[in-house]
Amino acid sequence: MSPLSDSDLLAAADAVAARAYAPYSSFHVGCAVLARDGRVIEGVNVENAAYPLGVCAERTAFSRAVAEGYRPGDFVAAASTASPCGGCRQWLQEMGVERVVFRNGGRVVTMTPDELLPESFDSSKLS
């Protein structure tokens, strides 16, 4: 089996975005996370009438992965249909993803979590 390309991973994020629950903004976001074992775990944004209670696609993908037994460091890449928000950048850092692929306007961008969130907060700051 050949490794999944970043463009394939982004295509998976595009496909799952159609299942987002975004009745208020109509802004559908999908995320596909590639685990080291080759599995792709998907997530979508889920809005709520009480706006702060909505959940981003990246967080639903990682929450699903953790519920299924994955842990930080088990992930190779994450692809999102939009530039990750600040909170999701922190999640990408925490989960130990090697690279993040996303659309920003008409461009496809690939960055590391450190590039997305320089000087990030991590567990080393807790001691």
Where are the regions a protein language model picked out?
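Short N-terminal helix-initiation segments at or just after the protein's N-terminus
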Residues: 20-25, 43-45
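Small-residue (primarily alanine) positions within well-ordered alpha-helices
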Residues: 13, 31-32, 61, 65
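Alpha-helix N-cap/loop-to-helix boundary motif
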Residues: 5, 23-25, 49-53
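Short, basic/aromatic recognition patches
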Residues: 8-22
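Short, compositionally biased leader-like segments
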Residues: 1-11, 104
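Short beta-strand scaffold segments in enzyme catalytic cores
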Residues: 25-35
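Zn2+-dependent cytidine deaminase-like catalytic core
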Residues: 42-126
